[in-house]
From Swiss-Prot:
Binds 1 Fe(2+) ion. Keywords: Hydrolase, Iron, Metal-binding, Protein biosynthesis. It holds the Pfam family Pep_deformylase. Removes the formyl group from the N-terminal Met of newly synthesized proteins. Requires at least a dipeptide for an efficient rate of reaction. N-terminal L-methionine is a prerequisite for activity but the enzyme has broad specificity at other positions. The keyword Hydrolase applies. It catalyses: N-terminal N-formyl-L-methionyl-[peptide] + H2O = N-terminal L-methionyl-[peptide] + formate. The active site is at 134. It comes from Haemophilus ducreyi (strain 35000HP / ATCC 700724). This is Peptide deformylase. One of its GO terms (molecular function) is metal ion binding. The lineage of its organism: Bacteria, Pseudomonadati, Pseudomonadota, Gammaproteobacteria, Pasteurellales. CDD domains: Pep_deformylase. Fe cation binds at residues 91, 133, 137. Its EC number is 3.5.1.88.
Amino acid sequence: MSVLQVVLYPDDRLTKVCEPVTQVDDELNQFIDDMFDTMYQEGGIGLAASQVGVLKRVITIDIEGDKTNQVVLINPEILESCGETGIEEGCLSIPGYRALVPRKEKITVKALNRQGEEVIYHADDLFAICIQHEIDHLNGIVFVDHISNLKRQRIKDKMQKLKKQLYRSKA
């Protein structure tokens, strides 16, 4: 198992729509383990494959962060949604920034699990918000796409400066 490099906004890979997974196999399961390792290392509760540069429709979630309730969603699809909610969301690809994002309060999502079996989750509250946030990533949307252009541009400018500083410190 290994920790993967998290892609930082405004990297173009975060704007790409991810491809469906066509085969659930040992290689994919190793990647999923690496995604969980990365998510825990970075202190997140959810991670989309595109956030580590892999443009496949795979999500890992662990709301509690204690490794006892890990959720894997492969090729997730929201079937139903209702209600309105929102919290200040953060993102591993945009460290240090948060914004209020409108979301559906309850959702029903269909996906494959890591064994390739179809699963259905009826999610609400933080679990529903996290699923929607990560599915946005699979569709090339980051949470700052939900805020004003001015705020988004400020964050983009600051993130580009941060990326340059990180690049210089590694050189």
